[in-house]
């Protein structure tokens, strides 16, 4: 006959002796009877000895004992006797026969009795016990030990094993060289057992004389003292424990549980102290969180207050280098100074939400930050900071472009002004000469023609002067910092130009008057002058154009310059022919002079330009053409590099931007419509958070490309709609969103565990909340909240609904969050500590007196929390109290906001 028994409501393990779910959780996890463990002879030996000693400690009360655990229980008689002793109940009369079926019947009666106590023994049958199966016999005894010796051990709502471990940790915490973390290796040196005995019976052991390097001596001391003075039989061998790498956990638990029961009478005061410590710890932790919030909020607001004026300062710098230093300072701010503050702001919101949740769960009044430090105040200040930051960056880039333009215009102005001043040098003196008065007719006509050529040259320079004036005007409009010197130079050029015009007109009038007196003019020299002057102007213009500086921002603009230069080069053959024709005129003059024996004039009376001048300028043009070719190709290469940078940045930004947007929407959907258990939701969110963190390298690479663009002074990108600022803002929004959503789920876990909610209840609450969350923003407006309550069966009048709103919306924000909704739905059924419970706990510590002394507090509570109570408790004002008596009733009421501390 095979019996499958298990304690009802015990454990969730999956071993052959594992239990189900419920209050007796001592069977879960490593409490499962692992069959493979018995393959270790050392563990089998320890369990056999320990379990035998444990059984004998109870059987001796009935005047019997066992010697061989797998043999002495085979007939079921001593097994039934053991159950009667430890339970205090009578079992059915055993069968007296010695046949196998009699033994099986007796064992089954014992197993039936175990089953009647809510214990399920999976895979253990009476036949295996009767057959002397050591593994099954040890498993059955271990289950009996769990049910009758360990199951009822509970410390602060923990499972049996966890409660026993926590009890051991608390009792041994003050002792040196003792660190109880488990029921195997933590007990090998014997100090933990000695500490347990010394904690409750300091008169039995001199703990100060114990040495950690003498484990066998320590263990034997504990065993002997326990057996002699505490009536706890020796269940273990010191040598087995020391020489085994990992002593058997169940043997240790069985032996340690005997100490727990031996010292159970001293636990009432400790339980009361634990309750007070728990309440005080909650209060102290909340106060610490409040102080941290105030400190973080003050520091963040102070940083914003200092930073905003700097970002709002729009005073420009006169030089490009100074503005670039400002831009570098701004980059350092975005890269080094702001990210930690973003993290602080996010952490501040998380701390605030966590604090409010803890206050609600512990029935403390809601935390109201000091004036100006609300989360909304910080959010408003942060928005102001970001607005100032965006305006500051736009202003910086605009100023840099303006200074670039100014620098280019100033260089162009100086170049053209220098060329013009070089051209006009001596022209006023030349126009003021009166040489025509003593000249011959031919010389006068030559002077006239020369003057005509000058006027042609002067007219050709009119555009240059107008261009110089236009450049000066543009520099003034762009607020050039050296505008005064530019204006002064431009005014001097314009005044000189007007004077040149006046002098030119006066000289023409004089020469035309003299022309009537003169008849001969050398036509060839005139022809030379007429053709050489415009060609010379063309040469000057060509030199000026070839030396001209440019400012381009794209490949297309550079290609346009290259095309214009190619077109100019195409005109060079025609210009060379014109040069040959002009030089041919001079050759003709020399030929005529040679033919007729004339003495050629050393100068052309119509023009000062010589053929050598034309050849020199022509050579200059020929040399400048390849130089400009090289410069244009270098600029084209630079612009092509910039274009590749633009495309590289755009390719990443066009991938990152939609990814961030998709993640933001995905997080929003997760927050609004979460399914599964809170742990599953948290795991999903943590996975999302890790995915987002892992994606940070893409943002860093994009920042690097953006840095290269800025260093190359590239400020536009037609290949993408995403700027670095868009990516940064989206990234910060994504980090904040995932952190806030994780915090909401953590708070729901706190609420669920504190209120005892099931996952089905949470899912039902979430479904109702989502249905009435019209805007899908995680909050219900008052009308939607009222409709939700009505749909759930609440009959609400105006006064009652107003009362409920003050509970779920204490700050009068006009919305109801999901956390507040859950708090309301579970408020009346929650099992929490109260002021009355704390008063009752203090009364136990005070020995039933209405007051308590500082000495009693220091004796029963940890030092830190005892001093905390002494500082905050008011003196007891009742009659018959000694000096220094403290009022613990008023103090307990103040902890829950029912009075002032």
Swiss-Prot record:
Ca(2+) 1 binds at residues 773, 777, 779, 784. Ca(2+) 2 binds at residues 809, 811. Homodimer; antiparallel. Also forms heterodimers with ACTN2. Interacts with MYOZ1. The modification N-acetylmethionine is found at residue 1. It comes from Bos taurus (Bovine). F-actin cross-linking protein which is thought to anchor actin to a variety of intracellular structures. This is a bundling protein. Residues 760-795, 796-831 form the EF-hand domain. Keywords: Acetylation, Actin-binding, Calcium, Metal-binding, Repeat. Belongs to the alpha-actinin family. Residues 1-261 are annotated as: Actin-binding. This is Alpha-actinin-3. Pfam families: CH (PF00307), EFhand_Ca_insen (PF08726), Spectrin (PF00435). Residues 45-149, 158-264 form the Calponin-homology (CH) domain. GO terms for molecular function: actin filament binding; calcium ion binding; identical protein binding; transmembrane transporter binding. One of its GO terms (cellular component) is Z disc. The keyword Metal-binding applies. Spectrin repeats lie at residues 288-398, 408-513, 523-634, 644-747. One of its GO terms (biological process) is skeletal muscle atrophy. PANTHER family: SPECTRIN/FILAMIN RELATED CYTOSKELETAL PROTEIN (PTHR11915).
